[in-house]
Amino acid sequence: FVTKEGKKYYLKSGKKLKSIILETKKYKYLLDKNGVVVTGWKQYKGKYYYFDRTSGKMAIKKKVDGISLDKYGRAKKNKLNVSKINTMINARKTVNKVCKVSDTKAQKLRKCFDYIAKVPYRRYRFLKPIYHKKGWESTFADDVFDKGSGCCVSMSAALAFMLHECGYSTVYVAHDSEHAWVELNGRVYDALFARAKDYNKYYNLSYSNFSCHPVDKRKI
């Protein structure tokens, strides 16, 4: 393996291998059409696989992001799983557009927050009637990733998925059934309120200084 400008490749006889699943003695890796080692979720030949977000190693016989993988690394396919995987794939694509490979996690957090804070506001549906159901966080996040706009729930869900791709593990979409925000490490990140009210206040805010109280939150 070689790393160039933050991207990992595999060379054989001095040439990059491309568009294949590479098997080493211990692990499998997916190399894309440019020879880059794939990280995160990926669809390959009609199946979904997960490759460690840092190393690119294929995961097998375990649960990742709440999704079961078989001994070949294939994700269990059902409507909820496929929806969440596609949302995570789109979140990763967006992070790659917004952030540099060399950015620190803190820099990525700020850049992702700033990006979401600029998303045009549009409400496609109400959260209150459906928040007891599974999968609404993917549905709302897709408003931003697929349509480029959304409400506070859409913005918060999209930001939460993006931060998850940046390597943050304790990320939640929290809400009071009408307004939503991101909870990260017990702190509030509210992109819509930041834009509409006070930009710096609603970035890394303590709950003691926040006017909303969560009735529900979903871990990404």
What are these regions (language model features)?
Residues 7, 120, 194:
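Short polar catalytic/cofactor-binding loops
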Residues 154-215:
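Hydrophobic/aromatic-rich core segments of domains that either
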Residues 57, 122-127, 188-190:
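Substrate-binding/catalytic groove segments of enzymes
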Residues 86-143:
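Secondary-structure boundary elements
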